[in-house]
Amino acid sequence: MKNLKKLLGCVALVTFSMSLSAQEQVQGFVHQQSKATDYVWPTDQQVLDKLAKWQDQKFGVLFHWGLYSVPGIVESWSICSEDVDWISRKGNLPYDEYKKWYWGLKDSLNPVNFNPEQWAEVMQDAGIKYMIFTTKHHDGFCTFDSKYTDFSIANGPFKNNPRKDVAFHVFDVFRKKGFMMGCYFSKPDWHCEWFWNPYFATANRRINYKKENHPDWWKNYQTFTQNQLDELMTRYGSFDILWLDGGWVTGDDINLDGILEKARKQHPGLISVDRSIRGKNENYQTPERGIPETQLDYPWESCITLSNDWGWVPNAPFKSPQKVINILSEITAKGGCLLLGVGPTADGVIEEEVTKRLHEVGKWLRFNGKAIYNTRITPVYRDGNVWFTADKDGKTLYAIYALPEGEKLPEVIEWKGNLPKGNMKLLKGNKRVKYVLKGDKVEVTLPKGRAICPKGT
């Protein structure tokens, strides 16, 4: 390394921990990453090129927005009997009545203040580079105007609004601002009679009938899924990522090979994220609510919420800007991307507290983003409280000091390995810092009086 730039700030914690919601406490990683031997590298050069571009972005946002946003409850899961061990329903309604109430939220979702321009401005200000928007979660409710179901925002109280096809307008606004574009789609659809057929009870997340006994039902569901994905891939502009959730539906083939073959004719190089289904259609992996212990030698992102939930809930405890920066820096040093979960309110805006916190993250990145964006991993990527990244040609090494929340910045920091061979500078201000080499260790004296932590920590 010819140069070593010292990035001082409130970044990665030495031991990563985060407040756990009920789901995390029960399951830990909701979608655990697999072994490197399970990853199948794409053979399509256009997909490989798109993956390389995506890996440069480092920081994305995942929007969950749907029926669950109206009462401010966990998304979809409360209508699934399998998940009673970690989610509780509000009130004392029997299951059938509760499900009827939940479906009926379609008549209450009326986002009169829907403002995708505000969403995009907040995320751009935060330094976010790619986006994933939930077009349909497991409950089957569509945020796009589908011809194949009436269970969508375009058929509720918002139907006469010129922006009733909210997915179209979200994608359109973000695309014009230069974000890489991702379309979230749930493979299971609990509202569709060809998935959860009303003739049978619904014991778990999967189809509630035997396909061998009802092959026509499953064929109808395959066709329904194909038709909806065709809509999204042909009527909603260009996409970089098709992000498919519901990987626990294993063995239920929706003809994804055919879907992707057709979609890539419309979107060359489209990245397929068939979550938790190891193989050729999972072009990058998505560990959820946690960070891998070590570097991984294949593409991946950690999906982590800004609050404790993916969708909007009232009075949510949000992570501090410092914690978000810590998480992003650790993930970057380990070779991944951070997909940050944000839930807009039921009336269609990003709430003020989210805006404030993400603004501080973005302010930090405006000075220190060189250590995050377009970087690559280094063989020695951590020592104590310091994380390392490098530029693509390997000529500049970035050292990111990990200041734990609540602690004061020390006057001197040190690390072993990755010793500087030339000047060391702060990214903010490009000023040199003093350092001393002592054997295999470097000691860096920090300049006094520099404000390097984000506000609101």
Predicted feature residues:
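Mature catalytic domains of secreted/periplasmic carbohydrate-active enzymes
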Residues: 23-457
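Bacterial Sec-dependent N-terminal signal peptides
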Residues: 1-25
